[in-house]
């Protein structure tokens, strides 16, 4: 299901609306924040999102939230696993911050993976895990 949010900090006046998607499959709950641009989630959005196993969150700034704001949103959602997205990659000409800035801000040691295969029984139970998917 989808949850309405904004692509900017001006209630959509600059970049319009964004949809947060909640995907439930095989007892795993994934939250994809899309081009989320708000500084933080509203109480209503947090309630609609609910418990999250895997959070896919933009971290590059400019068109979405930046590293510091992403850490704030992560603290609101408290997922078991984090997958950053929308950050600077080699050859990309858009002005985005690299994932290293987010990793430093978050303070977790990332696990680099080519492909993520996950089952409910393999989700972390104690500490949040940071996954960097390789391109």
Indicate where each model-derived feature is located:
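Proline-aspartate-enriched helix->loop->beta-strand connector
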Residues: 51-57, 61, 67-87
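Short, charged, surface-exposed secondary-structure boundary motifs
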Residues: 65-68, 92-94
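Core dinuclear metal-dependent hydrolase active-site scaffold
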Residues: 1-50, 62-65, 112-135
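Short histidine/acidic/glycine/proline-rich micro-motifs that form metal-
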Residues: 9, 61-62, 87-92
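A general structural detector for well-ordered alpha-helical segments in enzyme core domains, enriched
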Residues: 19, 45-48, 69-73, 98, ...
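A generic short-segment signal for beta-strand/edge and adjacent turn/coil regions
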Residues: 23-27, 52-53, 97-104
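Binuclear metal-ion centers of metallo-dependent hydrolases, dominated by the metallo-beta-lactamase
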Residues: 81-135
